[in-house]
Amino acid sequence: MNLGDGLKLETELLDGKTKLILSPYEHKSKVSVKMGNKFKIAKCPLRTKQTGHTLKSTQNTYIGNENLSQKKISTLDTSQAKPENSRLTFSPSTDKQYSEKDSVRVQKEISPTTSNIRKIINTTGTCPVAKQKPCKKNPTAETMNSGLVCLTQDQLRQILMLSVNQGNGSVCLTETGEEEASQDSLHLINIPSQPKDVNDTGFLQNTEAASPVTSEHEHVHRRAQEAFQQCEQKAATENEWKPADIFSTLGERERDKSLLEARRAQWKKELDEQVALKKKEKEASQKWHNPWKPSDIECEKSQVHDQSKEARLLESPCSAIKQEQQRKWIEELNKQVEDDQQRKAEERMIYSKGEEHDRWAVHFDSLKSHPGSQSRLSSQLTHQHLESLCVSPDTQELADVNGVFTPPPGVQAEPSEKEQRARPVLEMAVSHGPKTNFLRSMTALLDPAQIEERERRRQKQLEHQKAIMAQVEENRRKKRLEEEQRKKEEQELELRLAREREEMQRQYEEDILKQRQREEIMTLKTNELFHTMQRAQELAQRLKQEQRIRELAQKGHDTSRLIQNLGAQVDYKAFTTISSSHSDPEETADTSTASPKKDTGVQTDDVNLGIFNDALPPCGSVTEKGIRNISSPEISAEFSGQTDIRKENQELSMNKGTNLDKENSWHNGQCNQYRRTEKQTKLMKKCPKKPAWNINKPLKKYVPASAKYPAHLQKEKEEKKVQRQMELLHLVERNNPENLSQNRGISPLATSHRETESESRLHLIKKVEEPLKTPSVSKERFQTSPAVKNRTQQTQSNVLHLPLKNNDYEKETLTLGDGHTKLSDEMSEPSHFIPYVRTNEIYYLDPDAPLSRPSTQDNQYQKSHDCAREQELFDSDHIRDPLLNPKLVKNRDRQQAILKGLSELRQGLLQKQKELETNLIPLTANQEDNFSSSF
């Protein structure tokens, strides 16, 4: 709960100034809390309007900000159920926001004592009531009508004095004598202005209609006055004037709750009776009012239906003539209602069009006078001044533009007063009509010439727009024609493609049929050729066996059993040929069906057969394919014949090698041969098409992937391989301790000797250079820094002393090494840089030598050393070695520094060696590639 919730603020006029004060606090009862939860009224900022017709000196800060439609329904209920502080706020100003929404909003806070005020207000319904216009049929009309009453000046003064006595705030009546005389009956809702004659006639008719029920109203009025006097006496005793102090109202509680509930029930009952009386009065007044007026037709229709129902209930024996008259009357009324609605809709449309046109004309042509606009302006002024006479801005109900005026009936002020006030306003508006207004429009400073120029521009722009529209239409038409043409071409293309597809399909089917016929013919020819070859082989084998028998007979062997075996074998072979001839059609069908698979599957035929098939015509290919083996028809006949001949030769050689006396061994060999042939025939019957795997030689040699590279890439690869091997050999040689001592003992004589050897091998280098012709041998590749040149020179010269196992490889590497040496010698002649080679030559320095290092620019440094001195060092290396003989060292610090540097160099060298051995990437090759790419 926020600080300040529940406080009520008021404005009070003191010495002509508005001041904000706290109103006295009253505790709500449980019923009021429940009803407050049902109908919550939100708080909004204070809104005060000071006008000339102000009737109030205080204004409540509780201003309802609730949904308007919900407020319509709950106006009567909140007036009956909420026991809160009630003030009727009278203000002549208007609220345009609510007038457009057809809303009735009453600003209220109802207390237990002012519910008596509502009763008095409701009992005063017998006063002369102005004529009401028929309203639209909405569900809240009766509720609104029953909750709206009129007050006389005496009753209003009585209510205000009662509220002052009860301590709910001071109400100062600031109205003048002129206002008291003019405002005899102020109504609580905002009613639009009506013509004078309508108000006068309605007033007279309603007073006449209200006279029959006066006696009932007097009875109700008398009871209400008695209750009001009792309540006033009790309020005078209980509620005394309390100052508007926040501390004087804290902790005050409501008493006599049971009495309050009884009063509220009695008031509600009386209100219900009064609502019923008002409803009857309204029906009576509407029944005898002018039924043919177009504005009253809508409500009269409902009244006619109610009257007809009542008549049927009261007078059961109705005549047919009366019913016919009523039906005609209802039809005529319906027709009039429809015509009136149609006419109003048309007038509304015409009026809205004319109003829009006049508004734009006034806005753009301020030099012309528009009487229609002036009349509308005067009517708007009249409306504003008439609305200023209304009591509260929260109770306005103005008609919408699209609807009929629907003021709630029974609560209207006297028309004579309104007409008296509206007449001077109308005269003032008419008097101001011909005068020009002071609003400056867009064309106020333009002369007629500029207006004409604008008109010409507008016409030109319209013509331009028409031309653009015509052009757009033309483009659209062209696009449509192009689209139609394109669709037509696409359809023709689709038809042509369909015809071509059908033609191709038909041709394909014909080709397949021809291919099948050709394959069938080929299979037939193949089978015939196969049988002829088989018969020829059998005949040749029989002739060989007969020749063998004759040879054995000449040598004196017994050949009777061989002759018997030969006859049995001939009979068996004849039987097998007959059976195979019977199975020829089946084989042809099998081969014809299996031929497509044979084309796509693994080929087990002879490779030479495929070559012949490509080269020879179909007949030749048929003959070649027809040559088959007994065990497998797919094996070529030539190959099978060769294998059979080879087997027979082996058997003959074995028979010749055996002893002639041992007839049994020879007989067993013949029996084995017979069994072998019988087994082959059985296998052929079981699976005549069993493929023979791994009997054909491959068509091409196996070519490794490295040999499939282009020629120049293969050359580069070979060169890099040779160079890499050379570098690895150099590294191995340098790290070899034997070669280190040799490297240490190199003299200028040895280098000159190597140069002569390299010159002698120059011819071999040229022979190698001619087929290679790669950048690795060219001079541009070796145009690198002097350090790399000398290191390459040293490593390549060391290759000459390395023993190689492979003689061919030795020749190649030596020739390449000599070539590199020659080229590097030629290019390193003008160089002046002496490299620092990582060797252990530092161990053999003379201790007596100066500490300072000689200049690297001295070309004669190495030549200055005497050959005899170097030879002496090499001879006495073990004796004068500082590591072996530490007594020779005079400068220990220098020796330690040298040893430390040597250890670091050795570690680096070993690490480089490991990297090169593992990655097989030589250091010098990378350096040469980098230098060549930079240049």
UniProtKB/Swiss-Prot annotation:
GO BP annotations, alphabetical order: cell division; ciliary transition zone assembly; cilium assembly; detection of light stimulus involved in visual perception; establishment of mitotic spindle orientation; microtubule bundle formation; microtubule cytoskeleton organization involved in mitosis; microtubule nucleation
Phosphoserine modifications at: 366, 595
Coiled-coil ranges (or none) = 462-555
Q: In which tissues is it expressed?
A: Widely expressed. Expressed in retina by rod photoreceptors but also detected in outer plexiform and ganglion cell layers (at protein level).
Q: Which InterPro entries match?
A: CCD66, CCDC66_dom
GO CC annotation, single: photoreceptor outer segment
**GO terms, molecular function:** microtubule binding; protein homodimerization activity
Q: Does the keyword Cytoplasm apply?
A: yes
Keywords from the UniProt entry? Cell cycle, Cell division, Cell projection, Cilium, Cilium biogenesis/degradation, Coiled coil, Cytoplasm, Cytoskeleton, Disulfide bond, Microtubule, Phosphoprotein
Task: State where the protein is found.
Answer: Cytoplasm, Cytoskeleton, Microtubule organizing center, Centrosome; Cytoplasm, Cytoskeleton, Microtubule organizing center, Centrosome, Centriolar satellite; Cell projection, Cilium; Cytoplasm, Cytoskeleton, Cilium basal body
Q: Spans of biased composition, class Basic and acidic residues? A: 473-491, 752-782
Keyword Heme tagged: no
Loss of function: phenotype: Mice lacking Ccdc66 are viable but display degeneration of the retina. Initial formation of the retina is normal up to postnatal stage P10. Malformation of photoreceptors develops around P13. The degeneration progresses slowly until 3 months after birth, when the outer nuclear layer is reduced to 5-6 rows. From 5 to 7 months, only a thin outer nuclear and photoreceptor layer with severely shrunken outer and inner segments is preserved. It is associated with impaired photoreceptor function with early visual impairment detectable 1 month after birth and progressing slightly until 7 months.
Q: Entry's Pfam families?
A: CCDC66
Chief localization: cytoplasm
The annotated regions of Polar residues compositional bias extend over 76-96, 590-602, 783-794
The ranges of region (Disordered) come to 76-103, 470-491, 577-602, 738-794
State the source organism's domain of life.
Eukaryota
Q: Which residues carry this modification: Phosphothreonine?
A: 114
Q: Oligomeric state and partners?
A: Homodimer; disulfide-linked. Interacts with CEP290. Interacts with PCM1. Interacts with ARMC9, TOGARAM1, CSPP1 and CEP104. Interacts with CDK5RAP2, CEP152, CEP192, TBG1 and PRC1.
* Role according to the record: Microtubule-binding protein required for ciliogenesis. May function in ciliogenesis by mediating the transport of proteins like BBS4 to the cilium, but also through the organization of the centriolar satellites. Required for the assembly of signaling-competent cilia with proper structure and length. Mediates this function in part by regulating transition zone assembly and basal body recruitment of the IFT-B complex. Cooperates with the ciliopathy proteins CSPP1 and CEP104 during cilium length regulation. Plays two important roles during cell division.
Name it: Coiled-coil domain-containing protein 66
What is the source species?
Mus musculus (Mouse)
